[in-house]
Amino acid sequence: MCNIVVFLLTLTLFLFSGLSNTAFARVQYEPLKPKFGARVWDQKMIKNIKIEVDGSCSRRAPGRRRPPNRPPKPCTKP
């Protein structure tokens, strides 16, 4: 019984001492060009980033409908 009390007391001590340390460990975000309206600048930069993604070569998962009577398209990816 005494071991459980000591364990819980130690656990709560570590919990509350760790909460204050996490505030110091966080890295604050700073935009590359801090200026008036920096948030708007960040949103514009995010909108300008475009990623090209090709289609998948995987087949569709089986569903409730019957599959069509045509063969699947061949994959053209290397």
UniProtKB/Swiss-Prot annotation:
One of its GO terms (molecular function) is LRR domain binding. A motif (SxS motif essential for MIK2 binding) lies at residues 56-58. Residues 1-25 form the signal peptide. Residues 69-78 have a biased composition (Pro residues). Residues 57-78 are annotated as: Disordered. One of its GO terms (cellular component) is plasma membrane. It comes from the Eukaryota. A motif (SCOOP motif) lies at residues 50-64. Its main location: membrane. Keywords: Apoplast, Cell membrane, Cleavage on pair of basic residues, Membrane, Secreted, Signal. It is found in: Cell membrane; Secreted, Extracellular space, Apoplast. Brassicaceae-specific phytocytokine (plant endogenous peptide released into the apoplast) perceived by MIK2 in a BAK1/SERK3 and SERK4 coreceptors-dependent manner, that modulates various physiological and antimicrobial processes including growth prevention and reactive oxygen species (ROS) response regulation. Belongs to the serine rich endogenous peptide (SCOOP) phytocytokine family. Interacts with MIK2 (via extracellular leucine-rich repeat domain); this interaction triggers the formation of complex between MIK2 and the BAK1/SERK3 and SERK4 coreceptors, and subsequent BAK1 activation by phosphorylation. This is Serine rich endogenous peptide 19. It comes from Arabidopsis thaliana (Mouse-ear cress).
